[in-house]
């Protein structure tokens, strides 16, 4: 993919979107669709914040140029041309990243990759709002992921052992901005460099974990090459993708026929179509389990009128 034009310095007014733009940079090669929607979210949010100040207008104009260039490069990609496919792609990607971090957390494996995955998942759920309001489930995932990233980051920084798995969210005692501002407050101008996965709060990357590479397999598309650091003599945490467990299919679904008294609404058909799109997107990631679950949901909805 051709390099995009460089953005001007980020205006202070746009501090709230700097991490979404950084996430876009990180995904330019890994997943251009994700990168595109991160920039689209930043553009829409930036327009709401300040579209009149000269420096903001200049920044948004350059960002629009990037969006147009990306859209041209992606061509006929259905995740760009069809909103429902794009929504499914982005939601599945965010969920994969969330589940990777959640599995590491529940196993008591606390490291920068996991912290970064939790936080990036929360940012990507922000981005899903370009398609409309979030579901209650996504709102809960975003809140939990952002809190977990901050909580574990603070524990490791203070030399404490985080509590694994779900714990009560005490948002009043956690400063999310402390995690966001752990590094530089401006967008990185140099190419992203991989870093060791050894956690050292006194030696954090200047771009707030920008250099952390997330191994594919846990959440990334199967054809995404791993961008791992060359051997540096530092022991790193190698994450092995867990074997997929295909959910058991309820045999009753195959024998169920739509009864005459079942009346499906347009909303039912739209939800069924969405589940099928989610299944198709999951298969792009070779995620059979998620694909089967979504197809089962669609089949149940169409045959029973219930979810």
Curated annotation (Swiss-Prot):
Region Interaction with IST1, annotated ranges: 2-187
Location of region: Disordered: 180-240
Stretch list, region Interaction with VPS4B: 198-307
Domain of life: Eukaryota
Functional note: Involved in the endosomal multivesicular bodies (MVB) pathway. MVBs contain intraluminal vesicles (ILVs) that are generated by invagination and scission from the limiting membrane of the endosome and mostly are delivered to lysosomes enabling degradation of membrane proteins, such as stimulated growth factor receptors, lysosomal enzymes and lipids. Thought to be a cofactor of VPS4A/B, which catalyzes disassembles membrane-associated ESCRT-III assemblies. Involved in the sorting and down-regulation of EGFR.
Compositional bias ranges of the Polar residues kind: 199-211
Classification via Pfam families: Vta1, Vta1_C
Species assigned in the record: Bos taurus (Bovine)
PANTHER family named in the record: VACUOLAR PROTEIN SORTING-ASSOCIATED PROTEIN VTA1 HOMOLOG
Family, per entry: Belongs to the VTA1 family.
Presence of keyword DNA repair: no
UniProt keyword annotation of S-adenosyl-L-methionine present: no
Region (Interaction with CHMP5): 2-75
GO biological process, any: protein transport
A GO cellular component annotation in the UniProt record: multivesicular body
Protein name in the entry: Vacuolar protein sorting-associated protein VTA1 homolog
Keywords attached to this entry: Acetylation, Cytoplasm, Endosome, Membrane, Protein transport, Transport
């Amino acid at each position: 993919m051709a390099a995009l034009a460089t953005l001007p310095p980020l205006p202070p007014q746009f501090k709230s979107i700097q991490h979404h733009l950084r996430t876009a940079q990180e995904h330019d090669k890994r997943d251009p669709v994700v990168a595109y929607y991160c920039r689209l979210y930043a553009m829409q949010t930036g327009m709401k914040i300040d579209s009149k100040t000269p420096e903001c207008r200049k920044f948004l104009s350059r960002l629009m140029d990037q969006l147009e260039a990306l859209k041209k490069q992606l061509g006929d990609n259905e995740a760009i041309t069809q909103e429902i496919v794009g929504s499914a792609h982005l939601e599945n990607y965010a969920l994969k990243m969330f589940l990777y971090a959640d599995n590491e957390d529940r196993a008591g494996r606390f490291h920068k990759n996991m912290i970064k995955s939790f936080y990036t998942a929360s940012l990507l759920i922000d981005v899903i709002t370009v398609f409309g309001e979030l579901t209650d489930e996504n709102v809960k995932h975003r809140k939990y992921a952002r809190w977990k990233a901050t909580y574990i980051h603070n524990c490791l920084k203070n030399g404490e052992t985080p509590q694994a798995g779900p714990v009560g969210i005490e948002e009043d005692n956690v400063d999310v901005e402390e995690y966001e501002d752990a590094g530089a407050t401006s967008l990185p101008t140099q190419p992203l460099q991989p870093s060791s996965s050894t956690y050292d709060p006194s030696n954090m990357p200047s771009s707030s974990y920008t250099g952390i590479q997330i191994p594919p397999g846990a959440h990334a598309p199967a054809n995404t090459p791993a961008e791992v650091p060359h051997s540096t003599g530092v022991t790193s945490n190698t994450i092995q993708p867990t074997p997929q467990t295909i959910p058991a299919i309820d045999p009753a679904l195959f024998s169920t026929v739509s009864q005459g008294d079942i009346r499906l609404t347009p909303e039912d058909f739209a939800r069924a179509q969405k589940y099928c799109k989610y299944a198709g997107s999951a298969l792009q990631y070779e995620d059979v389990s998620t694909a089967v679950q979504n197809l089962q949901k669609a089949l149940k909805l169409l045959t029973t009128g219930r979810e």
